[in-house]
């Protein structure tokens, strides 16, 4: 059998039911990761988002939120995560009751993260910080995937389908862009990708965004715009300093743009499969 179980939460609006809304102390949680003035060298839509529209007709400025208020938001978000965890537990318990636990591959991941006050912003959008695009993944299959192992290789969501098909003994269909993660799970240290590409067409913002993330650098390209983003992930893991205009990183920027263009071409929609000689 195959079951795709998709949960909307955790997601705004942050309104978990009881008792989940009261599980976490807002004042005991870490303050958001941010630095005064960090958005000065970012593209203009970052600063525009500081006074974003909420889920009413009222506009508000995120800069006016206190650490306690950010903690309240994070506590609600954590409560929603616990709500989902508990219900995933119900699924796992049902598999165990039916004797299917050891013969079922379970893969858990998400589609994106949440700003939660990091960099002074909330929700999501065309801001490709790690807190939004670095998605965790848990894979469980007793006897096949080593329990308790951790892997740090670069992968993408498009790799999920080829991975499941390989474990099921099925050849991926023609034109699939992803690569199976099975070699990584078997312990191959050389497996994985050099870069991960993130795409976001934010038409209501008038932006088409593509980001290339590697171990050392991250580049974000905005189609038709003169601005962009470049981060040194080793020197600036919090992504506070945008190096797009830094001439000393010009060669890195050019190299990353070329790698991004290569990837865009590689992932174009495939032509129909050729079945004849001419």
List PLM regions with ranges.
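Hydrophobic alpha-helical membrane-association signature
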Residues: 84-87, 160, 256
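C-terminal cap/loop subdomain of S1 sulfatases and analogous C-terminal strand-loop tails that border
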Residues: 112-118, 145, 156-161, 166-233, ...
């Amino acid at each position: 059998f195959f079951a795709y179980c998709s949960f909307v939460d955790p997601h705004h609006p942050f309104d978990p039911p009881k008792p989940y809304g009261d599980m976490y102390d807002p004042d005991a949680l870490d303050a958001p990761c941010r630095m005064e003035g960090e958005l000065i060298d970012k593209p203009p839509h970052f600063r525009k988002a500081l006074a974003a529209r909420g889920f009413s007709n009222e506009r508000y400025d995120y800069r006016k939120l206190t650490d306690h208020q950010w903690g309240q938001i994070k506590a609600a978000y954590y409560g929603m995560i616990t709500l989902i965890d508990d219900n995933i537990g119900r699924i796992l318990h049902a598999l165990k009751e039916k004797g299917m636990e050891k013969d079922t591959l379970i893969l858990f991941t998400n589609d994106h993260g949440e700003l939660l006050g990091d960099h002074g912003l909330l929700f999501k959008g065309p801001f490709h910080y790690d807190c939004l695009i670095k998605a965790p993944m848990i894979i469980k299959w007793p006897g096949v995937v080593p329990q308790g192992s951790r892997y740090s290789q670069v992968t993408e969501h498009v790799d999920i389908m080829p991975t499941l098909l390989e474990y099921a003994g099925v050849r991926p269909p023609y034109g699939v862009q992803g690569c199976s993660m099975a070699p990584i799970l078997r312990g191959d240290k050389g497996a994985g990708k050099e870069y991960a590409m993130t795409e976001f067409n934010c038409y209501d913002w008038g932006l088409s965004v593509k980001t290339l993330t590697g171990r050392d650098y991250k580049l974000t390209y905005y189609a038709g715009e003169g601005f962009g983003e470049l981060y040194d992930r080793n020197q600036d893991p919090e992504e506070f300093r945008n190096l797009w205009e830094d001439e000393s990183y010009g060669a890195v920027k050019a190299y990353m743009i070329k790698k991004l263009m290569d990837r865009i071409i590689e992932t174009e929609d495939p032509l129909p499969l050729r079945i004849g000689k001419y």
